Curated annotation (Swiss-Prot):
Protein name in the entry: Large ribosomal subunit protein bL27m
GO MF entry, a single one: RNA binding
Organism name: Homo sapiens
Subunit structure, interactors included: Component of the mitochondrial large ribosomal subunit (mt-LSU). Mature mammalian 55S mitochondrial ribosomes consist of a small (28S) and a large (39S) subunit. The 28S small subunit contains a 12S ribosomal RNA (12S mt-rRNA) and 30 different proteins. The 39S large subunit contains a 16S rRNA (16S mt-rRNA), a copy of mitochondrial valine transfer RNA (mt-tRNA(Val)), which plays an integral structural role, and 52 different proteins.
UniProt keyword annotations, A-Z: Mitochondrion, Ribonucleoprotein, Ribosomal protein, Transit peptide
Transit peptide residue numbers: 1-30
Membership in a protein family: Belongs to the bacterial ribosomal protein bL27 family.
Length: 148
């Protein structure tokens, strides 16, 4: 009995392999062309932002004059210089503009600067450019002291 069942199974397996496959089972692919994309090279033709130094070393500035515009701190504020919302530097008093290179000591709460300092080799010093305005008129002198 078992041999008859085994013979029937093998016979059906062989006939299913040798029988022709139906036409619906065959997949036929024809050549096709995908439609072109609609991307364009937009932008890249805009003019520059005109950032940089507006007042050079030795120029006379009035209070409120913009000294430099910048995206990131390339120049740092010094004496009598303020910082705008967009990191532009402006004069707080009228006087003459001076640029100096000074040792940069970051605030301890500034984590990015502290991480940079700790990655430097021992004994290395960071120098940054600072912008100062030297006031034109001397700061208050006491007349009573001059009268003595």
């Amino acid at each position: 009995m078992a041999s008859v069942v085994l013979a029937l199974r093998t016979r059906t397996a062989v006939t299913s392999l040798l029988s022709p496959t139906p036409a619906t089972a065959l997949a036929v692919r024809y050549a096709s062309k995908k439609s072109g994309g609609s991307s364009k090279n937009l932008g890249g033709k805009s003019s520059g932002r005109r950032q940089g130094i507006k007042k050079m070393e030795g120029h006379y500035v009035h209070a409120g004059n913009i000294i430099a515009t910048q995206r990131h701190f390339r120049w740092h504020p010094g004496a009598h210089v303020g910082v705008g919302k967009n990191k532009c530097l402006y004069a707080l008093e009228e006087g003459i503009v001076r640029y100096t290179k000074e040792v940069y000591v970051p605030h301890p709460r500034n984590t990015e600067a502290v991480d940079l300092i700790t990655r430097l080799p021992k004994g290395a010093v960071l120098y940054k450019t600072f912008v100062h305005v030297v006031p034109a008129k001397p700061e208050g002198t006491f007349k009573l002291v001059a009268m003595l």
